[in-house]
Amino acid sequence: MIVSIRGAAGVILGALLLGSSAACISSYAAEIPASTSSDFALPNLLSAEDASRYRDIFTLEAQRKWRDADREIAALTDRLLMPEVEAQRYLSPNYRATYAELRDWLAKYADAPSASRIHALALKRRPKGEPEPPTAIVGTGTAAAASHDRPRSIGAADEAAYANGGQSQAWLAGLAAWRAGHMDAARKHFEAAAHAGASSWAISAAAFWAARAELRSGHPELFNYWLGIAAQNPRTFYGLLARRTLGVDSYIEFDPQGFGALEAQIMTGIPAGRRALALIQIGDTARAEAELRGLSLRGSNDVQRAIVALADRTNMASLSVEIAAHVAEDQDSHSDRAQYPVPRWKPRGGFHVDRALIYGLMRQESKFRPVAHNPSGASGLMQLMPGTARTMAAHTGVHGPVSDPAVNLTLAQQYVIELLNDDRVNGNLLYFAVAYNRGPNALAGVKNASKNGDPLLFIEGISNRETRLFIHQVMTNYWIYRLRLGQPTPDLDALAAGEWPIYTALDNSAEAPIRHAENR
């Protein structure tokens, strides 16, 4: 399904020419996405009895009740998950695994997620004169864990084109000429930046500004041409703005890839795929994700697409984003539904801020990883700093580890509400993004640096590159999640028209206590 969003191109064209809009652009409702349900049932590879026994075994081993666990193991009729069971035991600090146990495990299960750790332990336990144990297969253990950060690094590398070589010089020269009112020079610099751009984000940004400069410099016949260049990258900040300005479809696709008979056949034909399905059956999604993450690094294109479908189907949000981004890059095949998952986590007491904004922040901040931690000290799904978490805990009465999704979302939602209501923000989404990224005290400096009333120039005038890119990415996520949830995007209309985007609550489930005042 292509989500249809139409813009008022003539009105927006005038707004871009003048730098602000005197007209109000109405919101355009998106088509409601198709149902997420599927008639194809995930295969249950374990009998009900074995599924129950495996749950008990993992619990007993976590409690160091080895003999009780052994009795349950002896009663199993299917030993599919024994690699996980034995790895949990052998890696426990309360169990002394022998070299023979570790060597034999590696001989049978070198493709399992714990293989690298088991191999390292086996090397430590290897008696003199014994041959080295079998090695782990590439795509397990630390290699797979390292790939966990790949979506963030891909995005950073993509967007880093803003700061690379000739493209960066032309881009900065274009902005300087624009500020000085030298529009003919600005358009030439932006055109050069668009031609030199090495990423979709850089190309769409330069092309969009080239379109603006063409109007200002008296070349309206080139306006649509440069907007069309920007619009070729619909999953970027300026690409979405360009498509809204032109009044064309967003080209964001939310049809589920679907986990069906073919995907089931692919997954059940691979040991790691079978283990992942069995782990999903017993409710152990953490171990299932580890299996699928390792498999994705060594699997074929068909295997990777099957993993994307399974991750989307089973609500593995972090894995869904990670693998879908990898597939999009390597296979030029976008799965927008998988790249913009709707996780099941909720704040305590429910949502009081629209989910699109919360999900948009979460996708950028942690890629949906509850245990994400930044060297700066920020932690959890919404990357809360310790001081912020303590303050919001005092305001909400909710306490607990920020690695707990419900706790993190509850505290972060309160922080979002307080920022949006802050007199320095007053519902302005661009100011809000700055405040969330750098703290509300940073707003005074960035506001003073740009007083001409042009929201886009405000963004590009922010000296901190991380904050600029944060605004681009969070707003892009936010708009795409609006579409994912079947909602209009009035703030996209506003920004395309040269106006400041103001938060408007649209969720029926979000009784957001946000003031709706004029931006100051």
Question: Where do the model's predicted regions map?
Answer:
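Bacterial N-terminal signal peptides
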Residues: 10-22
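N-terminal leader/linker segments that initiate helical-solenoid repeat arrays
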Residues: 28-76, 80-85, 133-154, 165, ...
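Alpha-helical segment of the N-proximal tetratricopeptide repeat
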Residues: 52-65, 146, 168-182, 270-287, ...
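Residue-level recognition of tetratricopeptide repeat
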Residues: 58, 91, 175, 209-212, ...
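Catalytic glycan-binding domains that act on GlcNAc-containing polysaccharides
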Residues: 79-92, 96-115, 121-123, 134-139, ...
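Alpha-helical adaptor scaffolds
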Residues: 158-159, 166-198
